[in-house]
Amino acid sequence: MRPATALIDLDALRHNYRLARSRHGGRALAVVKANAYGHGAVRCAQALAAEADGFAVAFLDEALELRAAGITQTIVLLEGVFDAAELEQVVAHGLWPVVHHAAQIEMIEQAALARPLDIWLKVNSGMNRAGFVGDAVGSAWQRLRASGKVGEITLMTHFARADEPQVIATAEQLADFDTATRGLPGPRSLANSAAVLGWPDAHADWARPGILLYGADPMPGEGNGLQPVMTLESGVIAVRDLAAGAPLGYGARYVAERPRRIGLVAMGYADGYPRSAPDGTPVVVDGQPSMLVGRVSMDMLTVDLTDLPQAGIGSRVELWGRQVPINQVAAGAGTIAYELLCNVKRVVFRYRG
């Protein structure tokens, strides 16, 4: 069997959820959209089911997958519904849709619902991606209430730069949210992962921890005690001696400056490892630090074994996880941990805890 695996530590997932809930102080939705950021939504939700206050997904199909797997807690649909036909299933399965534009209000007004919906009303406080702005927030709230088809209305917003504590954008968004929602009753939900960790003023009734659940710290410094949930590993499948001056891989990006011993690893960009990872990107081979050399191929990559004489065919190679911080790999590749995690595929997933 090909040795590429993603080891998912469910104890670490639970640790991170508890940390988020403790730091925030209120209830916390575990965000498991995008297949739990590549970790497996059903397995992650089941692991958190005994203690999570609820879950958040992007759209209806993701929620239905959780319901079919026995998840009974609150599930929020962060994109809301896409057409009126979805409202029947939303009601039937007890889901809470986000309402972020007027067409969704019209769907609710015109629908024949078996019972009132609890909804989350999204405020655009400065990210300018989705939601109602300024006075339109109050108007939307009044329309929803006047429809007679909604129960509790939770007011929410989303921060664009909460992971940049030195800039004032988040403080400005908080002020804009407070102005737009002044006088409107109901719970509030403001804090994403970065705000849970770095913006106490954003702590309200509901937090929405996402990336932090999976152990990738969104804040500079990474001193928040998160534990990595995914360890991406594979094995050395061949070893080659490379002479000084010899090129390696596509484009001859790497040229050996001295004789090198190279390990070929069964992992490539088709598995989700970034093709843009540069020479020198850290890896760990049999518990010892090493590095990527040469361009990542579709199914394979190459690592330096020169100073690891005991390493050879069958040696385990950690690409990120417990020993190799995913944020370090992402930064070198010019991307973010979110993208790397969501892109993992073609590997065997193994769960523990």
Curated annotation (Swiss-Prot):
Catalytic residue list: 33, 250
Binding positions (substrate): 129, 298
Catalyzed reaction equations: L-alanine = D-alanine
Transmembrane segments: none
This protein's UniProt keywords: Isomerase, Pyridoxal phosphate
Keyword Isomerase attached: yes
Gene Ontology cellular component list: cytosol
PROSITE patterns (UniProt xref): ALANINE_RACEMASE (PS00395)
InterPro entries (UniProt xref): Ala_racemase (IPR000821), Ala_racemase/Decarboxylase_C (IPR009006), Ala_racemase_C (IPR011079), Ala_racemase_N (IPR001608), Ala_racemase_pyridoxalP-BS (IPR020622), PLP-binding_barrel (IPR029066)
Annotated GO biological process: D-alanine biosynthetic process
Residues with N6-(pyridoxal phosphate)lysine modification: 33
Biochemical pathway: Amino-acid biosynthesis; D-alanine biosynthesis; D-alanine from L-alanine: step 1/1
Stated family: Belongs to the alanine racemase family.
The name this protein goes by in its record: Alanine racemase
The organism of origin for this protein: Azoarcus sp. (strain BH72)
